[in-house]
UniProtKB/Swiss-Prot annotation:
Similarity field: Belongs to the prokaryotic AdoMetDC family. Type 2 subfamily.
GO molecular-function term, one example from the UniProt record: adenosylmethionine decarboxylase activity
NCBIfam families attached to this UniProt entry: SAM_DCase_Eco
Protein name: S-adenosylmethionine decarboxylase proenzyme
Organism: Yersinia pseudotuberculosis serotype I (strain IP32953)
Entry GO terms, CC: cytosol
Modification type Pyruvic acid (Ser): residues: 112
Record key words, sorted: Autocatalytic cleavage, Decarboxylase, Lyase, Polyamine biosynthesis, Pyruvate, S-adenosyl-L-methionine, Schiff base, Spermidine biosynthesis, Zymogen
Site feature Cleavage (non-hydrolytic), where: 111-112
Listed PANTHER family: S-ADENOSYLMETHIONINE DECARBOXYLASE PROENZYME
Superkingdom of this protein's organism: Bacteria
Length: 264
């Protein structure tokens, strides 16, 4: 897409939101309480603030204000307002490719906010526990928040990820013509690194005419030891391992596809 000469400021709003899920099996009620306490501490407001602040550092944004809160009995929220940076549109790379990691060069972010909310929960009987983090990066200007995607998914290792990217509003060129998107995109996947894509099953549901893009991700490899809380596979019988594996797989399938799977 050729560079546009705009009349005034770029008024397009670009929003990236995604949910990450961590799945775990905790056998007893005490273990389930222990998992929720553990994950609640791992992703408390201070830790989330560190992650989002590092995100701002990577993309070259200045933090104006931070609002954070831990909740009782569990969960946390952090919202960061970011200052507007003057950006020359000619210097902005709008091509489809993975965004930066902490060791890479930074990109500038215009008016924006970054927020995260966490939701730990557990099944009342089956031993299944899930942790969900909702993250949103929203910008107003020439930069796409997709540039922050690669870092955030690397930082928040997860079993399942669902992502939505949308562009809203319009901006005018010097001839008064409205433009409803200012960069090429056919999939969120194009903004992820190859090593990340190799780890996940992926599925797209895109509505191109509405500038809405949706991608789901689920880990390909399943290793039971990574899903047990306060237990080891060698401590379980073959029957228990098979039962727990089936429970976890069903839980992941239901979250990935967004519907309950009937018993067979």
């Amino acid at each position: 897409m050729s560079k546009l000469k705009l009349h005034g400021f770029n008024n397009l709003t670009k929003s990236l939101s995604f949910c990450i899920y961590d799945i775990c099996y905790a056998k007893t009620a005490d273990d389930r309480d222990g998992y929720i306490a553990y994950i609640d501490e791992q992703y408390n407001a201070n830790r989330l603030t560190e992650i989002l602040s590092e995100t701002c550092s990577i993309i070259g944004a200045n933090i104006l204000n931070i609002a954070r809160q831990d909740y009782d009995p569990q969960g946390a929220s952090v919202t960061i307002l970011v200052s507007e940076e003057p950006v020359d549109p000619r210097d902005v790379d709008t091509s489809e490719h993975p965004g930066p990691l902490p060791s890479a060069v930074v990109a500038h972010l215009d008016k924006s906010h970054i927020c995260v909310h966490t939701y730990p929960e557990s099944h009342p009987e089956a031993g299944l526990c899930t942790f969900r983090a909702d993250i949103e990066v929203s910008t107003c200007g020439v930069i796409s928040p997709l540039k922050a995607l690669n870092y955030l998914i690397h930082q928040l290792e997860s079993d399942i990820v669902t992502m939505d990217y949308r562009v809203r509003g319009f901006t005018r060129d010097i001839n008064g013509v409205k433009h409803f998107i200012d960069h090429k995109i056919n999939s969120i996947q194009n903004f992820m690194s190859d090593d990340m894509k190799s780890l996940y099953h992926m599925m797209d549901v895109n509505v191109y005419q509405e500038n809405i893009f949706h991608t789901k991700m689920m880990l390909k490899d399943f290793d039971l030891k990574h899903y047990l809380f306060n237990a080891k596979p060698e401590e379980l019988s073959a029957e228990e391992k098979e039962q727990i594996t089936c429970l976890l797989y069903k839980e992941m399938q239901e979250i990935y596809y967004g519907r309950n799977v009937p018993e067979v």
